[in-house]
Regions:
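Small-residue (G/A/S/T)-rich helix-start motifs and N-terminal tracts that mark the onset
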Residues: 1-161, 169-186, 191-350
Length: 350
């Protein structure tokens, strides 16, 4: 495999050059990310660019849901709907601007009632789901997660789902959860969530080492999980690893301590959900989502430094990253390097 130069923005060359296995492990860079961008047809409408359903948030973690929704919008989703417990719908409806809200039925102790909630979710028009950020822990949430993974939409292929936070913690208690899942999934655990997941879900450790700092151990463990579960695993942290069931493992070049703050993972979930809704498969959506998120973090760090960055600082930089990637994609089209545009194979345009 030829050596790949890491991300532009002038920041990651040294880190990649010093990585002992850089020639053997694909590293995300601006050219690779640009090739993954979903189409944006000039005559597209809201439905063209995908509908995201975020099942997120609770009274204690309202911010997680708001971050998911804003990130999904900034990553290009045409429509975003936030599904929340019905007693909290007025609170969230007053906070979101571009997103709409949907009430999920509750039981008599104001927990989400899984069965009628699943019926309402499946009746909703969506192209991708983000499940977990800020959900209230408990048996009701665990059952909601189990049922959603196991129950397809009636009239379409099962919508893909991004699983984060409380969804992952619930799955760790479900044993071999993947055997009952009918949906394409992208799991986005941090190392602690990943350890709980693989301990409860029959994944051999695969490698000794620190899953926060040992790149070899992180790649080996993430790949073992992805191949056991049959779903994409995004093992977050410095130099995030994206592992796919087909054996593809990609390492992100980002090492930004400014992202070590609450809510940045919720932003990532929203970005990946938006890319799934725009038609990308789980692997490409995860790779491009990690790239957009990490580069947005670098842009914010350039302005603010590596301390004091807030998760809410990230979404507004995502369109700037995408705009740059569009330029990269244009420059890499056939004929561009020669200074002309090829039309219908007839040679240089006038």
């Amino acid at each position: 495999m030829p050596e790949r130069r890491p991300l532009g923005f002038g920041r990651h060359e040294a880190a990649a050059a010093s990585a002992k296995d850089a020639p053997a492990v694909p590293t995300l860079d601006d050219k690779a990310a640009a090739a993954l961008l979903p189409e944006r047809p000039p005559r597209g409408h809201k439905g063209t660019f995908g509908k995201v359903l975020a099942i997120a948030g609770s009274l204690d973690y309202a911010g997680a849901a708001l971050l998911v929704c804003r990130a999904a919008g900034r990553a290009g989703a045409g429509l975003v709907t936030l599904a929340v417990p019905e007693s909290l719908q007025p609170l969230f409806a007053a906070k979101v601007v571009e997103a709409t809200t949907m009430a999920l039925p509750e039981d008599d102790v104001e927990e989400v009632d899984p069965e009628p909630s699943i019926a309402r979710i499946l009746d909703h028009d969506h192209d991708a789901i983000v499940l977990g950020p800020g959900l209230r822990p408990g048996l009701a949430t665990t059952e909601l997660v189990r049922m959603l993974l196991a129950t397809p939409e009636d009239d379409a292929a099962p919508a893909p789902v991004v699983l984060d936070a409380e969804a992952l913690r619930s799955m760790a208690t479900l044993g071999e959860w993947w055997t009952g899942s009918v949906r394409p999934c992208v799991l986005t655990p941090h190392p602690g969530e990943f350890e709980r997941l693989r301990t409860g879900a029959g994944v051999e450790a695969g490698a000794d080492g620190d899953l926060s700092g040992d790149d070899d151990a992180r790649r080996t463990a993430a790949l073992a999980a992805a191949q056991t579960w049959g779903h994409v695993v995004v093992l977050k942290g410095a130099r995030t690893v994206i592992a796919e069931p087909d054996g593809t493992v990609t390492t992100a070049p980002f090492e930004n301590p400014g992202l070590a703050t609450g809510g940045t993972g919720d932003v990532l979930s929203g970005v990946i959900g938006a890319l799934l809704a725009q038609g990308l498969a789980p692997g490409p959506a995860a790779r491009l989502g990690v790239f957009l998120h990490g580069t947005a973090g670098d842009l914010v760090r350039d302005r603010l430094g590596d301390a004091g960055l807030l998760a809410s600082d990230l979404p507004d930089s995502i369109p700037l990253v995408r705009k740059r990637l569009v330029g990269v994609a244009e420059r890499n089209k056939p004929g561009k390097r020669l200074g002309f545009t090829v039309r219908n194979g007839d040679g240089p345009a006038a």
